[in-house]
Amino acid sequence: MFKRILVAVDGSKTSLKALDKAIDLQKLIPEVEIYIICVYKHHSLFEASLSIGRPADMDIPDKVLSEYAKEVVNHAKELAKEHGATKVRGFVKAGKPSRVIVKFAQDKEADLIVVGTKGTNSDKDGMFLGSVSHRVASNAKCPVLVV
């Protein structure tokens, strides 16, 4: 059935609900590996120059975002282990979240992707699905569980 489950987290409540579902599945199928990924949007030098302006600080946005993503993944791994998950690995990637999640799932041969309905940047009163979860569900080659 499932060997690898990829869970996309961003620190939002819905991404932690997605993690809970992956943990529940691992309890039913103990040999399942849970891969936790947090993707931060990489900023080009041009984008960085618009917001900061000093050449020496051009890489600060990526450093800050990368560190935040690492914290999110580490927190998610700790939560997973506290809730009984055994085989858990964490990954941090830069890029467009939906594309990176779909490609990473293909590269790691994930059998299932679990995402929250809306992430940290979603409009609370907007559509039923956030743009990342919608794009992942539309483009993934494996099943996607939206929580």
Language-model segments: what does each one mean?
Residues 1-56:
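Small/aliphatic-rich secondary-structure junction motif
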Residues 56-70:
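A short acidic, glycine-rich active-site loop
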Residues 51-55, 106-108, 131-132:
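Short, hinge-like loop/turn segments at secondary-structure boundaries
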Residues 75-113:
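Structural beta-alpha unit
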Residues 115-138:
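Glycine-rich, Arg-bearing micro-motifs that act as flexible, cationic patches
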Residues 143-147:
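Short hydrophobic/aromatic patches at helix-to-coil boundaries
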